[in-house]
Structure formats: C-alpha cells, structure tokens
C-alpha cells in the first residue's frame, strides 16, 4: 500500500487572544468577491478560521486543549472554507462545534449529527440533552446549527433529519470510528456518510491510532484503530485517501494502558491510579486523514 509522507504542521498565526464576534464576522465576510484571486480567498479563510479559534467565545477549558488537538491546523488540513456545508458527526459536548458554528455561520451551514433523544444508552441520551441545551443557551452562536441524528440500527441508510440539499461539502469525525467499529456498524455508517457528501467532497477523520498489526479484537476494546483498517474500510465505502498528517501524533503514547485510550486525558478513567503518568503522556496518538468521495 502506498504510504503518504507526513505533513508538517502549519504554524499558528499570531492573532490577539480574544476577538469579538463583530471582528470574527468581519473577517468571515471579507474578500469573498475576489473569485479571480483564489490565493487571496484562501488567506481570508485562514485568517477567519484563526480568528474563530482565538475567539473570546470559546471556553477556557476548551482553549486549554488546543495544544493537544490543533484545531486550526486540523481544519485547514481538511480544506474547510467558511462557505461550506458541513456535517459534524457525533459532536459529543461540542468541542469542535464551538469552532465550526461561528466559522460557518455567515456563509456556510453546519449540521450536527448526534445520538438519538431516545437512545437506549443513558449516557448517550444525557450527552444529546446537554448538547441541545448548549445550543439553546447561546443562540447568537448556535442558532443556525441544524441538529440531527446519527445513523443507528436499523436506520443505517440515512442521517435522520439531516439532508443538505445537493450534498455536503465536508463530513467530519473526531475520535469516533472506534465506537462504530466496536458497535459493529462501521462499514454501514461509512457508506451513509459517503451518501451525504457531494462527489469530490471531503471526509475528514481524526482517530486514535493503534500500532500496525493490532488485532481487531484489541482495537474494539482499546479505542485505538490501525490506519490500515481505516483506509481499507473508507475505500470500500467510496472514499479515496488524498493526504494524511502527523498533526495529532503523540510519540509518548504507548497505547498499552489499563482500560485503553480512556486512561489518558481528558477522560482519565483510572482516577488517581498512575494519574501523573497519564498526564505526562498527554492526549492520545492520533491519525489525521483527508479523504474525498469518489465519483
């Protein structure tokens, strides 16, 4: 299998730590009449994204994880533009939604596919309810987010109540593939995501990375997935890998933790046991893949 070379992370932009919503909107609206100047348009998009990432609307706790999650560089790598229609899969507590919603608010569209309100798992129902409350409590930021439901048994063939006209420009998933692999519907879900995309649209994947050759059974229990498995399953669903990056790599992660990836921050599921060791490792070693939907 062809190996793509690692991509050097882009430098962070030197912008003020806090920008007002008015400043962010001004950046998002600037420069888009310059259709004949794609480089200028890309620069404006980069500046707008940096403004949102550095925006004062973000919680201190979320901003504190930027050094581990690299949101500016990751979203640039996926080729995201403010005019895009985007589906964010399984947004959890909304860490990335806090960035995507204002970035796409003026010119694009954000769809968030969360767990069902009546999901049989109490934790998932609670997560959905908390996400809905977050959106409702900040309409200035989230009033244009369209909330829908992830494909779950038996409705694998649709993203319930999410149907972007003409298809989405991008579908994004952050640290979710292992859940669908463990649940046994990764392949069906990937096909559903492909159907939601335009031909040539982007599928952005960030996932905890298992060591090459890790057995499937271990992947299902540890939360780490091999790159080869992700590439193979994505290709079978209609995606081609166009680039991969080491933006979210962590060479300190041994991937051999009691209770799997959840032993590491931010979950720290083992409590005080080896807590300092896990904090020293930091967040997991992760692959970052950019796929496109085949025609």
Residue ranges of predicted features:
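N-terminal secretory signal peptides
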Residues: 1-19, 23-35
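Class I SAM-dependent methyltransferase Rossmann-like catalytic core
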Residues: 49-75
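Conserved class I S-adenosyl-L-methionine
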Residues: 84-92
């Amino acid at each position: 299998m062809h190996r793509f070379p690692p991509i050097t992370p882009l430098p962070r932009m030197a912008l003020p730590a806090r920008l007002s919503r008015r400043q962010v909107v001004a950046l998002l609206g600037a420069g888009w009449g310059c259709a004949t100047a794609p480089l200028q348009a890309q620069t404006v998009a980069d500046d707008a994204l940096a403004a949102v990432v550095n925006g004062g609307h973000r919680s201190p706790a979320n901003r504190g994880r930027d050094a581990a999650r690299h949101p500016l560089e990751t979203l640039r790598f996926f080729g995201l533009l403010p005019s895009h229609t985007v589906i964010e899969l399984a947004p959890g507590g909304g860490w990335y939604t806090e960035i995507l919603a204002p970035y796409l608010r003026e010119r694009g569209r954000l769809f968030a596919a969360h767990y069902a309100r009546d999901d049989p798992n109490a934790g998932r129902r609670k997560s959905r309810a908390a996400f809905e409350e977050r959106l409702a409590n900040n309409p200035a930021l989230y009033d244009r987010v369209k909330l829908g439901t992830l494909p779950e048994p038996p409705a694998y063939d649709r993203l319930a109540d999410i149907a972007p006209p003409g298809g989405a420009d991008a579908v994004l998933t952050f640290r979710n593939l292992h859940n669908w692999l463990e649940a046994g519907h990764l392949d069906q879900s990937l096909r559903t995501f492909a159907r939601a995309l335009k031909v040539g649209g982007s599928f952005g994947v960030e996932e905890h990375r298992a060591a090459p050759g890790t057995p499937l059974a271990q992947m299902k229990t540890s939360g780490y997935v091999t790159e080869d498995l992700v590439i193979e399953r994505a290709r079978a669903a209609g995606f081609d890998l166009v680039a991969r990056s080491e933006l979210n790599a962590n060479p300190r992660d041994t991937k051999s933790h009691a209770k799997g990836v959840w032993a590491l921050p931010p979950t720290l599921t083992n409590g005080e046991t080896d807590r300092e060791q896990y904090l020293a490792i930091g967040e997991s070693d992760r692959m970052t893949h950019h796929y496109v939907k085949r025609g």
